[in-house]
Amino acid sequence: MFISISAGIVTFLLTLVGIPAFIQFYRKAQITGQQMHEDVKQHQAKAGTPTMGGLVFLITSVLVAFFFALFSSQFSNNVGMILFILVLYGLVGFLDDFLKVFRKINEGLNPKQKLALQLLGGVIFYLFYERGGDILSVFGYPVHLGFFYIFFALFWLVGFSNAVNLTDGVDGLASISVVISLFAYGVIAYVQGQMDILLVILAMIGGLLGFFIFNHKPAKVFMGDVGSLALGGMLAAISMALHQEWTLLIIGIVYVFETTSVMMQVSYFKLTGGKRIFRMTPVHHHFELGGLSGKGNPWSEWKVDFFFWGVGLLASLLTLAILYLM
């Protein structure tokens, strides 16, 4: 436990030092920052804010987790595969950000390219991680999927990678939402005695807390796709490594809600010839524009943050209660 906590502290300190250096480099190199293409007027002031800051907490977390696990004899197949997903999905996000920032391609990677790279990572993860017989745990009951587990694994990794990416639209929202989710998985890992996975979790929590100091409202830096895609993939990988896949539907309710809102909006828009359910999706923008109803007073970014963090925290506590108190 001491090793895991130490890893989190080291990552926190390294990120705390690394982010200001990253921002300074960004400014000196006169790199064009985040472009704003949203209809939320208050976001227009954010144009030019340095992005790709997720690169800092990703590098520090992966390196610290790797070396701490290696030198404490806690490096395992599961640790290796979680770090692999972080690196590969981080590279996908980096390429996406690179095309947007340096090549001025607003779309970045097109959907097919991004999906292909994410699926590739999912296939490699499936082939090498310790699966335990391709068994899916559904509320504690084993479901034998056999060969079909690979389709679940791909759906899980790609789905939650993109879901966290959608959540990253308000200052600080995604970073602390993921911290809350990781805390819940840290408890599960500790109870299961999987200290190797706990080490990776605490290393990333440290990195995200260090990043949040510069990412809260008003954000001095954004994590970019390099951070959000990696974090979503990590959560999915951890839920599978702990054989508690179903828990991510509750622990990750914020990401599920954000993604579902987009799917509902697009489907309803097509079916009704242009009508909308929400003012704007992902749904955090709906709250920004008009509160819960969409027709009330706009919510500040802090209010949106605390609402979603509260939902995520309650969902995480509910999951732990279901697992260990019922």
Curated annotation (Swiss-Prot):
GO terms for cellular component: plasma membrane. It holds the Pfam family Glycos_transf_4. It is a multi-pass membrane protein. Keywords: Cell cycle, Cell division, Cell membrane, Cell shape, Cell wall biogenesis/degradation, Magnesium, Membrane, Metal-binding, Peptidoglycan synthesis, Transferase, Transmembrane, Transmembrane helix. PROSITE patterns: MRAY_1 (PS01347), MRAY_2 (PS01348). The keyword Cell wall biogenesis/degradation applies. GO terms for molecular function: metal ion binding; phospho-N-acetylmuramoyl-pentapeptide-transferase activity; phosphotransferase activity, for other substituted phosphate groups. InterPro entries: Glycosyl_transferase_4 (IPR000715), PNAcMuramoyl-5peptid_Trfase (IPR003524), PNAcMuramoyl-5peptid_Trfase_CS (IPR018480). Its EC number is 2.7.8.13. The chain crosses the membrane at residues 3-23, 51-71, 79-99, 115-135, 138-158, 169-189, 195-215, 221-243, 306-326. It catalyses: UDP-N-acetyl-alpha-D-muramoyl-L-alanyl-gamma-D-glutamyl-L-lysyl-D-alanyl-D-alanine + di-trans,octa-cis-undecaprenyl phosphate = Mur2Ac(oyl-L-Ala-gamma-D-Glu-L-Lys-D-Ala-D-Ala)-di-trans,octa-cis-undecaprenyl diphosphate + UMP. Pathway: Cell wall biogenesis; peptidoglycan biosynthesis. Signal peptide: none annotated. Its cofactor is Mg(2+). It is found in: Cell membrane. GO terms for biological process: cell division; cell wall macromolecule biosynthetic process; cell wall organization; peptidoglycan biosynthetic process; regulation of cell shape. Catalyzes the initial step of the lipid cycle reactions in the biosynthesis of the cell wall peptidoglycan: transfers peptidoglycan precursor phospho-MurNAc-pentapeptide from UDP-MurNAc-pentapeptide onto the lipid carrier undecaprenyl phosphate, yielding undecaprenyl-pyrophosphoryl-MurNAc-pentapeptide, known as lipid I. Belongs to the glycosyltransferase 4 family. MraY subfamily. This is Phospho-N-acetylmuramoyl-pentapeptide-transferase. It comes from Streptococcus pneumoniae (strain ATCC BAA-255 / R6). The gene is mraY.
